[in-house]
Amino acid sequence: MDSYEVGFKTSYLDGAGNFDLTAFVYDYTDAQVISYVDVDFEDDGIIDAFSGRVLNVGQTDGMGVEASTTIAMNEYTTLYLSLGYLNTEATGLEDICSLDGPDGEGTGCEGSRVFWAPKMTGAGKLDVAVPTGNGSINTSFEVSYESERGGSWEGYSEGMIGSYAIANLRVGYESDNNWYVQAYAENLFNEFTWDGYNANGGILPSHFFGPMRPRTIGIRTGISWD
């Protein structure tokens, strides 16, 4: 695997803001991937199950850009924003592709993207900390976004995980005497998605895992000692 990266950092607004930019490219030869094949135990022409196998095949080329900034908007408020873009292309997947090309040579996956990696990602977080007599009232609102991914090398629609955005909100009081209490709402807008997807085959082309926890509201408290 060969990879190259270049970065740039600077500050602005008289040091109140920081900006980071990173660009990278890579090529990965003989990537290790899992492929599923049908199994006929009784040799009767009926598929009884499928089995996974690990192969080193093809080449993956990728390039991407990541940018982030942090801004102290005033003495109480800080804003963080980030954005990422990833473009990938896989070739030489004949040994694991179940889609035939024009001559039946299994090249229907040529040019596929790395299916488990979203093309676009983004995040934002707003923190507000307002001092009080014996502590501070702290508020945090954050959002993270991913574009669609999944579908295996073949791009099966059954295996796609759609784009989604998750938001969290926290409001609490932190005492100067080392204790705090906080109310929170995680997955504020009750978004649903999956952590990931197994690219199977045969009668079960997709298997999702890790369902997103629904909107969760609660209160937490804690104490620490110096």
Predicted regions and their residues:
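Repeated loop/turn-to-beta-strand initiation elements of outer-membrane beta-barrel proteins
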Residues: 14-19, 76-79, 133-137, 177-181
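Short, glycine/charged-rich beta-strand-loop motifs at protein surfaces that mediate ligand recognition
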Residues: 22, 154-160, 168-172, 207
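Short, P/G- and charge-enriched loop/turn segments at secondary-structure junctions
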Residues: 7, 54, 110-112, 156-157, ...
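C-terminal beta-signal and adjacent terminal beta-strands/loops
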Residues: 27, 34, 144-152, 173-226
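Membrane-embedded beta-barrel scaffold of Gram-negative outer-membrane proteins
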Residues: 1-57, 61-63, 72, 89-91
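Flexible, surface-exposed loop regions and adjacent strand-edge segments
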Residues: 35-44, 50, 86, 92-105, ...
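Transmembrane beta-barrel architecture of outer-membrane proteins
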Residues: 1-5, 60-68, 117-123, 164-168, ...
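Gram-negative outer-membrane beta-barrel transporters
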Residues: 25-27, 49-153, 222-224
